[in-house]
Amino acid sequence: MTRDELKTTKIGVLMGGLSAEREVSLASGGAVLKALQSRGYDAVPVDVGRDLPQVLVREWIDVAFICLHGRYGEDGTVQGLLELMGIPYTGSGVLASALAMNKIVAKEVFAARGLTIAPYRVVRRGETVDPVAEGFGYPVVVKPSQEGSSVGVSIVKSPEELPSALELAFRYDDDILVERFIKGREIQIGILDDRAMGAIEIVPVNEFYDFEAKYTAGKAEHICPPVLPAELHRRLLAEGEAAHRALGCSGYSRVDFLVTEGGECYLLEVNTLPGMTALSLLPEIALKESGIGFEDLVERILISAELKIKGEGAGS
């Protein structure tokens, strides 16, 4: 949609939601809402609950700017509802959102496309796992299949720590991942209009870039752009775009990597609805690597809003 067309519409900023990342979503949505209103758009907040269809109709929402994180927002469910209601929306479509949210399926897609991922084992509720027997050894990373912002994630350094880590992860999902721990630098790639904008390195104060480090000032250092050999920097940008394409993402995303001392790049995940808070990484990459300020970034994402399902009957 064009800027002029969007100025005549009512934009609902979808935020909050039902996931464990509700508070982060409210922060992202609040920042986006302020940016849109400052640019003269008729934008209103929509706190997403199970009455979302009724709210969208009652508020006469024409376009949805999705600022949801986690389940029931980042996983294709809301995207499917918007497709059914014929409301154009920002970000990736139903399938790409669902694939990216499910770390197990996403890893299978990445591996099929030749992208490097850490060795892993899927553990389902009621099963046990021995990292030594799997060839991983310790430490390992234990994480739920379908949560974001490091919710339910643990770094396990010994057999004694494994049961509590599994118990924590199973609070959030019936399927979890046990991955070989890769020691390396955390590099994240920002994607806008399906092209890599640049990279950022995260150096957490503590050992692990956890939920607190992601959303608390002073808990992590951001280095943008990261200090990398030129060839490695180019490779990360290219692999970031490749991961975005592999899942069929559209518009924007953030792609997370671990880079070892030897220059190996391990793809961790693709975030189809990255945070848009004051401490979020995508806005920082946009500004420092591409000279795109926050309001411009929000507007460019808005302009990309569309229905992804094409064909007869779509959006009618």
Swiss-Prot record:
Span of domain ATP-grasp: 107-303
Keywords on record: ATP-binding, Cell shape, Cell wall biogenesis/degradation, Cytoplasm, Ligase, Magnesium, Manganese, Metal-binding, Nucleotide-binding, Peptidoglycan synthesis
GO cellular component, one term: cytoplasm
Catalytic activity of the protein: 2 D-alanine + ATP = D-alanyl-D-alanine + ADP + phosphate + H(+)
Signal peptide start-end: none
Metabolic or biological pathway: Cell wall biogenesis; peptidoglycan biosynthesis
GO biological process: cell wall organization; peptidoglycan biosynthetic process; regulation of cell shape
Cofactor: Mg(2+); Mn(2+)
Entry note: cofactor: Binds 2 magnesium or manganese ions per subunit.
Ligand binding (ATP): 133-188
Disulfide bonds: none
EC number, as in UniProt: 6.3.2.4
Binding site for Mg(2+) 2: 269, 271
SUPFAM superfamilies, per database record: Glutathione synthetase ATP-binding domain-like, PreATP-grasp domain
HAMAP family per the UniProt record, alphabetical: Dala_Dala_lig (MF_00047)
Function in brief: Cell wall formation.
Annotated family: Belongs to the D-alanine--D-alanine ligase family.
Annotated protein name in UniProt: D-alanine--D-alanine ligase
Annotated organism of origin: Geobacter sulfurreducens (strain ATCC 51573 / DSM 12127 / PCA)
Gene: ddl
